[in-house]
Every structure is written in structure tokens, then in C-alpha cells.
Amino acid sequence: MIKTCLRYFGGFISAQEKWLNKMAKKGYKLVKAGKLMYKFESCDKGKYQYCVDFIADKSHRDAESYKQFLEGCGYTVYYKNVNLGLSFGKVRFRPWAKGSGKVSSDFTTMYKELLIVEKLNDGKPFELHTSNEDKISYYKNWRNIWLTYFALFALMSLIFLFNPIVSIVLGALGICALIPVIAYQVQIGKI
């Protein structure tokens, strides 16, 4: 039986991962992931486990190489988007990324910011980032993304000082962007 679900998680990767694992516990295996759509087929309850990994900071070549590495380990891997494709033009600048990953387009990693990784459930926790250095690097990537948003909103707030309402709104958005920065820094401190 095929089951189709419409969901949008945005940047809430852990929520997406929990939902996919909940679906697996109910007896559904992911077969396709689109912008908003997830297609599942019936399977034994709890047969699969899922992990979601953020790869938007990688270049197209590095992302493809990482995907092939995971597939070589026996995992099934699906690309997934974070954004909905609502942008000006077909090129996006990612200041937090490395190397050629700073620029994404339809031909590179524009709608391939996440990897959904599936494995057979062996009863062990499923983690892709196992070493402390790996976890720190992963959390720093997320922290830096939100730090970039904070800096942009703070700068725009200063630019629009002549319009107090706009400046206050932009400043408030900047402060909101600091919440995940602090949360990821706390995670880094715990490691």
C-alpha cells in the first residue's frame, strides 16, 4: 500500500527525523521525498530507522561524494529540500558554506540541502555524526547559519534607523535569530 503525506519542516531537522522514525514504527518505509510530499510503502513495523543530515554547506561534488559514501555503507539515501524554492532567480548565495558550496543553483545543491538516510533497524541508535569533532563541526555549521541571519538583520536594522518601526522589526528578527545561535553554542559546550 502506498501512503502519501504532505509535510513541511523547514530547518527543523530533528522534527523531520522524529516524524520519519515514527512513520517507520507504524510500518511505513520511505520511497520518495519531494518538496512537500513524502511517499511511503507498507513494511514491517519498526523495520527501518532514519537519520536526516544537513549538507547545504557542502559543494555539489562533496555532497554527491558523501551520498555515494553512505550508499556504499549500505544505506538508502534521499535528497530533500529545506526551502520551498521561493527565491529571486535560480542562484542562491550561502555565506556560511565552504568553497563552491557558497553558490547553489538548480544544477548543484539548491533543493538538495538535506540527506534522508535510511537503514535497517538493528536495535542500535542511528547516528551519522559519532565523533566529538564531527558533532562540534555539525553544530558549528548550524550556529554559523543563524549567526549570518542575525548579522544581516542587525545590519538592516541599523540601515533603517530613519524608519523606527522597520528598524525595530528587523532588530527583533535579529534577536530571534540569536536564539538558535545560543542553543547550538550550548550543544557545542556540552560535547
Where are these regions (language model features)?
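Terminus-proximal functional modules
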Residues: 1-191
